[in-house]
Amino acid sequence: MGAELCKRICCEFGTTSGEPLKDALGRQVSLRSYDNIPPTSSSDEGEDDDDGEDDDNEERQQKLRLCGSGCGGNDSSSGSHREATHDGPKKNAVRSTFREDKAPKPSKQSKKKKKPSKHHHHQQSSIMQETDDLDEEDTSIYLSPPPVPPVQVVAKRLPRPDTPRTPRQKKISQRPPTPGTKKPAASLPF
């Protein structure tokens, strides 16, 4: 059961046999607690014990070949694990087909290289980095541009015409200035 679970996890998350498994928070996960769980399928109940053991050994070896070296040694089954990982050309052939199935995965990494993340100051798992990159892309679309500093608007006054427009304004401008009043603004130079 542990080898089957190990194979499923390796295939699902794309980890290689030498890397330790990590959860979403980057902590290492151990599968040793799943090694001794008996299989839940009921197909072995009606068969003879001798035939069932041979089938189980062949099936276990095949699963271990697919899984590589047991996902970094987390599979602590007996000698069949050691025999299965030292198959030579068979193991390499199975691994090469396994890697070909995972060929689309590197394209995600190439996207990551094109758009480098700003958060390279600490180590993260690849899943967390991909989600961070996606979050940055999504939020950058909705962010407004930086505020533009206000432009200094200098009010320029146009000079007033020398002659008043109305007859009343003419009359007022012709009066001599009194000590309490100021000269009209039209006569002040700017």
Swiss-Prot record:
Biased composition (Acidic residues): 44-58, 130-139
Compositional bias annotation for Basic residues: 108-123
Transmembrane segments: none
Bias (Basic and acidic residues): 80-90
Locations listed in the record: Virion tegument; Virion membrane; Host cell membrane; Host Golgi apparatus membrane
Membrane topology summary: Lipid-anchor
N-myristoyl glycine lipid attachment residues: 2
GO biological process, any: viral budding from Golgi membrane
One cellular component (GO) term of this entry: host cell Golgi membrane
UniProt entry keywords in alphabetical sequence: Host cell membrane, Host Golgi apparatus, Host membrane, Lipoprotein, Membrane, Myristate, Palmitate, Phosphoprotein, Virion, Virion tegument
InterPro entries: HSV_CEP3_betahv
Compositionally skewed regions (Polar residues) per UniProt: 30-43
The UniProt record lists the keyword Transcription regulation: no
Chain spans, region Disordered: 14-190
Keyword Lipoprotein: yes
Superkingdom field: Viruses
PTM field: Myristoylation and palmitoylation (probably on one or more of the nearby cysteines at the N-terminus) enable membrane-binding and Golgi apparatus-specific targeting and are essential for efficient packaging. Phosphorylated. Phosphorylation does not seem to be required for recycling to the host Golgi apparatus. Packaging is selective for underphosphorylated forms.
Family listed: Belongs to the herpesviridae cytoplasmic envelopment protein 3 family.
Primary role: Plays an important role in the cytoplasmic envelopment of tegument proteins and capsids during the assembly and egress processes. Also participates in viral entry at the fusion step probably by regulating the core fusion machinery.
Quaternary state and interactors: Interacts with cytoplasmic envelopment protein 2; this interaction is essential for the proper localization of each protein to the assembly complex and thus for the production of infectious virus.
Name of the protein: Cytoplasmic envelopment protein 3
Organism, as annotated: Human cytomegalovirus (strain Merlin)
Top-level taxonomy: Viruses, Duplodnaviria, Heunggongvirae, Peploviricota, Herviviricetes
